[in-house]
């Protein structure tokens, strides 16, 4: 009886999970890189709505060094799309987290390597930039013109 209940719970759990759309693989890789480089008390999600460029879209001038990391990352993705015909949000790539740095694998000039380098540069930039609480959830209409 116990085995039947356990199997039923697993099947229901798997069926429920089947309706959840997967995150694009690259975004999962990028989140892992960010978690590796930022201070322990922060979560990657705290960077998702920061300044004028960290999060969806972006406009105006970056408001600080951390926001500039996101601005550069956005432009890097834009270049990958326009110049190299890559799709950064779904591009898979190989990398290694080691000794407080990130190593991207793959041949130079390939979409995987280009996108990995964009994410690597941004994640390391996040780790070296001050996080200012007052720059989270700012009024972008007011401060990002």
Swiss-Prot record:
PROSITE patterns: PA2_ASP (PS00119)
Compartments, record wording: Secreted
Post-translational modification: This enzyme lacks one of the seven disulfide bonds found in similar PLA2 proteins.
Known catalytic reactions: a 1,2-diacyl-sn-glycero-3-phosphocholine + H2O = a 1-acyl-sn-glycero-3-phosphocholine + a fatty acid + H(+)
GO molecular function, one term: calcium ion binding
Keywords carried by this UniProt record: Calcium, Disulfide bond, Hydrolase, Lipid degradation, Lipid metabolism, Metal-binding, Neurotoxin, Presynaptic neurotoxin, Secreted, Signal, Toxin
Transmembrane portions of the chain: none
A cellular component annotation (GO) from this entry: extracellular region
Quaternary structure annotation from Swiss-Prot or TrEMBL: Heterodimer; disulfide-linked. The A chains have phospholipase A2 activity and the B chains show homology with the basic protease inhibitors.
Cofactors, names only: Ca(2+)
Cofactor binding, per record: Binds 1 Ca(2+) ion.
EC number(s) per entry: 3.1.1.4
Residues that, per the record, bind Ca(2+): 53, 55, 57
Protein name as it appears in the record: Basic phospholipase A2 beta-bungarotoxin A-AL1 chain
Pro-peptide region(s): 18-25
Tissue expression profile of the protein: Expressed by the venom gland.
Protein task: Snake venom phospholipase A2 (PLA2) that inhibits neuromuscular transmission by blocking acetylcholine release from the nerve termini. PLA2 catalyzes the calcium-dependent hydrolysis of the 2-acyl groups in 3-sn-phosphoglycerides.
Signal sequence range: 1-17
Disulphide-bonded residues: 52-144, 54-70, 76-118, 86-111, 104-116
SUPFAM superfamilies, per database record: Phospholipase A2, PLA2
Domain of life: Eukaryota
Active site, renumbered: 73, 119
Keyword tRNA processing in annotation: no
Organism name: Bungarus multicinctus
Annotated family: Belongs to the phospholipase A2 family. Group I subfamily. G49 sub-subfamily.
GO BP terms in the entry: arachidonate secretion; lipid catabolic process; phospholipid metabolic process
């Amino acid at each position: 009886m116990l085995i039947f209940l356990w199997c039923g719970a697993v099947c229901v759990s798997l069926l429920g999970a089947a309706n959840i759309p997967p995150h694009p693989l690259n975004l999962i890789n990028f989140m892992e890189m960010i978690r590796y480089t930022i201070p322990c008390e922060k979560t990657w999600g705290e960077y998702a709505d920061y300044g004028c460029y960290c999060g969806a879209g972006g406009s105006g001038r970056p408001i600080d060094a951390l926001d500039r990391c996101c601005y550069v990352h956005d432009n890097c993705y834009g270049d990958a799309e326009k110049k190299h015909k890559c799709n950064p949000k779904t591009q898979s790539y190989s990398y290694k987290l080691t000794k407080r740095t990130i190593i991207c694998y793959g041949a130079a000039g390939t979409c995987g390597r280009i996108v990995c380098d964009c994410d690597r540069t941004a994640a390391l930039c996040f780790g070296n930039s001050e996080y200012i609480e007052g720059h989270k959830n700012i009024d972008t209409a007011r401060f990002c013109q």
